């Protein structure tokens, strides 16, 4: 019988609870099981079940576990399940005997009343009345045993241990909200507005920021629009999900900072930071490192079969693959799946009809698990958020960009490709095998090589490197015998290459490797075009072996000199060289006021395609001059934009390079979409265009512009730095990078995001008005070219 009890404890009790509740159980059982701080941190569910079996000989601690679960509102359903499982083991006869011991006057129970009897054992009526009395009695009546009052809540045990002290028996603790197990969808909606058991935690806690989402807009039950973001923070012993309802704190929750939080709320295993909370950066003597196991635990996503077993009311975070999307009038059903099963995610409000497709990954924040008819669903609530991780770009299926076979994709590391600068001479290029075939280079590779040579010459000469002789890195089709390399003078000065040129050369070498591999050139040995100072005497050409060994071959991966915060792990630099003509560019503007981060927008085009560009390196402003032809490489493709960062290569193309952009393509770049077209577009796309302001309304932190044309009206919602622009009814707004967001009535609205920009085109009578620095005035309708 003891073994059966242990099976219930482990397989149907501990196994199905989440990590936070398991840590809570360990804390509550710490006295009974003699768990020290290290054991509480390191023991897993199996080890705890073993200790419970040893300590509680009769039922392996099942009764104790049921009592704990009953005190946690989100686990009440699970407590009932465990009672029924315990009843099955004990049998009806033993249940009747137990009932007689408790209440000798009670009649023998039937099978159905046996369930209630078992419930009485774990939560007898007298105990319920006593608990109710305690709640009314005040502080004196609220004292209970330490083992029942010390979960490692963010403000209690967990945070205390993180700061080097054990939780006090009298520490005020927080309780998750009283989630009902009722499965009616109306109850789910009601649950969003029902007051939760919020516990104000005044004690300051020190945490490290692990990650944050972008700010997003949500709607309160009072139909008021507000902005928030989610974050994940950690101490040295545990992590916490945080709702940050004060977006002015975004800078604090940034860059792996260590911060101090006080006056926050705690509920649902979450922390809530609002306008009343205090957040400050920790001092230099308050730094600490979060163990990797805590970081990995914070990133962990539960398997779907485990979610199906969890109690209704749990809050869920995680990354799931989208299998199917069904859009209804007010809700969207996202069917997610993994290798263990499937589950529906119901999105409403800001989670309704987000732009995603099958194969994308959905990162869910703060979704509620609900059950109905033994079926589990994840339901979005007021603060829920979905972040899309797009599947592999379809362009990867293009033969031009498909991965090459293993032997074609392997090159030596940079150290073997001669990119070091030990002294002041140029290194003699490494030569290919002596007998390459005449088809060693394809025609496409020859074109690529020609482009690369031109590009490298321009870039290095532009950086100020003065080569005393012919440019030695030109490469081309190899003949049937090795070429004698062109050698520089024997005594160039030690300042032959500047540090800046060294960086340029390193970038160019990396870029050429990526480009030529992408084009399909098959180099049987080390890359021959690496350049750099060598020793004080010429090198004999280094010849690779006829059959290169795998010891010096490795799969080439693009190397980024700097990994900016804006680039997520799902985005990658595009290594292909893109020659474009600049059509227009905005002025530089500050998009992050506190850190004074600047950027500008641009529109560029090839001879058959137009691209919107976000440029985060304002030193490149001169490059993005209208009608100039430039070459761009190592840029990032995201959300329909090309993004240019400090690691991106941008250079002028030869003066004799001509590019004719069709007039129809130029017109398409400057056209403003009609409002009725916007209403039918996919929500989540980004919009540029010029619209007339029909009405302006300022409400709190937001400014609402009603724009109109001859096809309809739409609302533009502006937040943050753009709310102070000088704009009146009748003016025109040139909007850049505004997100098309869903709105009730399925009309949609345009919302400002962090990279949005507004240019005000004033009417003649207001021409002399002073404008906000974030905007500019223009009276000519020909604003694009």
Swiss-Prot record:
Residue segments, region Disordered: 91-191, 390-442
Induction of the gene: Strongly induced by IFNG/IFN-gamma and, to a lesser extent, by alpha interferon. In HL-60 cells, maximum induction by IFNG/IFN-gamma occurs within 12 hours whereas, for IFN-alpha, only 10-fold induction was observed after 36 hours. Induced in vitro by dimethylsulfoxide, retinoic acid and 1,25 dihydroxyvitamin D3. Induced in monocytes by IFN-alpha and viral dsDNA. Induced by glucose restriction.
Gene Ontology BP annotations: activation of innate immune response; autophagy; cellular response to glucose starvation; cellular response to interferon-beta; cellular response to ionizing radiation; defense response to virus; inflammatory response; innate immune response
Highest rank taxon of the organism: Eukaryota
PTM notes: Ubiquitinated by human herpes simplex virus 1 (HHV-1) ICP0 protein; leading to degradation by the proteasome.
First-listed, main subcellular location of the protein, grouped into a coarse class: nucleus
Family matches, as SMART domains: PYRIN (SM01289)
MF terms in GO: double-stranded DNA binding; identical protein binding; RNA binding; transcription factor binding
Protein's organism: Homo sapiens
Span of domain Pyrin: 1-88
Listed name of the protein: Gamma-interferon-inducible protein 16
Modified residues (Phosphoserine): 95, 106, 153, 168, 174, 575, 780
Gene (UniProt): IFI16
Effect listed in the UniProt record for changing residue 674 to A: Impairs DNA binding
């Amino acid at each position: 019988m003891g073994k059966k009890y242990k099976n219930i404890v482990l397989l149907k009790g501990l196994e199905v609870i989440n990590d936070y509740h398991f840590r809570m159980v360990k804390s509550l059982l710490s006295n009974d099981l003699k768990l020290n701080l290290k054991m509480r941190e390191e023991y897993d569910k199996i080890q705890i079940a073993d200790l419970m079996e040893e300590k509680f000989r009769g039922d392996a601690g099942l009764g104790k576990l049921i009592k704990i679960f009953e005190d946690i509102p989100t686990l009440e359903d699970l407590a009932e399940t465990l009672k029924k499982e315990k009843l099955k083991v004990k049998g009806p006869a033993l249940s009747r005997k137990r009932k007689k011991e408790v209440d000798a006057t009670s009649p023998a129970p039937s099978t159905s009343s046996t369930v209630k009897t078992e419930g009485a054992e774990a939560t007898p009526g007298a105990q319920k009345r006593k608990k109710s009395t305690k709640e009314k009695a005040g502080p004196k009546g609220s004292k209970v045993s330490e083992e029942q009052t010390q979960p490692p809540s963010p403000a209690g045990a967990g945070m205390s241990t993180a700061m080097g002290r054990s939780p006090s028996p009298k520490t005020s603790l927080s309780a998750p909200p009283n989630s009902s197990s009722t499965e009616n969808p109306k109850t789910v909606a009601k649950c969003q507005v029902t007051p939760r058991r919020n516990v104000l935690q005044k004690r300051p806690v020190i945490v490290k920021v692990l990650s944050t989402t972008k700010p997003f807009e949500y709607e309160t039950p009072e139909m008021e629009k507000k902005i928030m973001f989610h974050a994940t923070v950690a101490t040295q012993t545990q992590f916490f999900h945080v709702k940050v309802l004060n977006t002015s704190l975004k800078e604090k929750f940034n860059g792996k900072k260590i911060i101090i939080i006080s006056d926050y709320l705690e509920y649902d295993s979450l922390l809530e930071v609002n306008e009343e909370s205090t957040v400050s950066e920790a001092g230099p003597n308050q730094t600490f490192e979060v163990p990797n196991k805590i970081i990995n635990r914070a990133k962990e996503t539960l398997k779907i079969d485990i979610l199906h077993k969890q109690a209704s009311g749990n809050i869920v975070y995680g990354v799931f693959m989208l299998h199917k999307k069904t859009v209804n009038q007010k809700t969207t059903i996202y069917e997610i799946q993994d290798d263990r099963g499937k589950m529906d995610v119901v999105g409403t409000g800001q989670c309704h009809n987000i732009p995603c497709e099958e194969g994308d990954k959905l990162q869910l924040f703060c979704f509620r698990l609900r059950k109905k008819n033994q079926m589990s669903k994840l339901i979005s609530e007021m603060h829920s958020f979905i972040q899309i991780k797009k599947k592999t770009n379809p362009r990867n299926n293009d033969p031009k960009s498909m991965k090459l076979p293993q032997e074609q994709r392997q090159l030596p590391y940079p150290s073997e490709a001669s990119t070091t600068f030990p002294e002041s001479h140029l290194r003699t290029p490494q030569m290919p095998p002596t007998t390459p075939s005449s088809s060693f280079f394809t025609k496409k590779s020859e074109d690529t090589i020609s482009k690369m040579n031109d590009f490298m010459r321009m870039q290095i000469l532009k950086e100020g490197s003065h080569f005393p002789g012919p440019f030695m890195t030109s490469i081309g089709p190899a003949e049937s015998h090795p070429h004698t390399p062109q050698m520089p003078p024997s005594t160039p000065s030690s300042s032959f290459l500047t540090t800046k040129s060294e960086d340029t050369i390193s970038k160019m070498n990396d870029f050429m490797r990526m480009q030529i591999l992408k084009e399909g050139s098959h180099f049987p040995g080390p890359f021959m075009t690496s350049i750099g100072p060598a020793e004080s005497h010429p090198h004999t050409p280094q010849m690779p072996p006829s059959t290169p060994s795998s010891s010096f071959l490795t799969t080439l991966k693009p190397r980024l000199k700097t990994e900016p915060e804006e680039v997520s792990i799902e985005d990658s630099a595009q290594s292909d060289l893109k020659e474009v003509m600049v059509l227009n560019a905005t002025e530089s503007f500050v998009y992050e006021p506190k850190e004074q981060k600047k950027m500008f927008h641009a529109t560029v085009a090839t001879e058959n395609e137009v691209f919107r560009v976000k440029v985060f390196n304002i030193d490149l402003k001169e490059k993005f001059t209208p009608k100039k032809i430039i070459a761009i490489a190592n840029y990032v493709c995201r959300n329909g934009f090309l993004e240019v960062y400090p690691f991106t290569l941008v250079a002028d193309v030869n003066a004799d390079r001509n590019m004719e952009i069709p007039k129809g393509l130029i017109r398409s770049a400057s056209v403003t979409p009609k409002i009725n077209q916007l209403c039918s577009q996919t929500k989540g796309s980004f919009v540029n265009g010029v619209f007339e302001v029909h009405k302006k309304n300022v409400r709190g932190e937001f400014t609402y512009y009603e724009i109109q044309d001859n096809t309809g009206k739409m609302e533009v919602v502006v937040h943050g730095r753009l709310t102070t622009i000088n704009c009146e009814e009748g003016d025109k707004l040139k909007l850049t990078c505004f997100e098309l967001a869903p709105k009730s009535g399925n009309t949609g609205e345009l919302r400002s995001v962090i990279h949005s920009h507004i240019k005000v085109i004033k009417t003649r009578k207001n021409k002399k008005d002073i404008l906000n620095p974030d905007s500019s005035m223009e009276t000519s309708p020909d604003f694009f070219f």
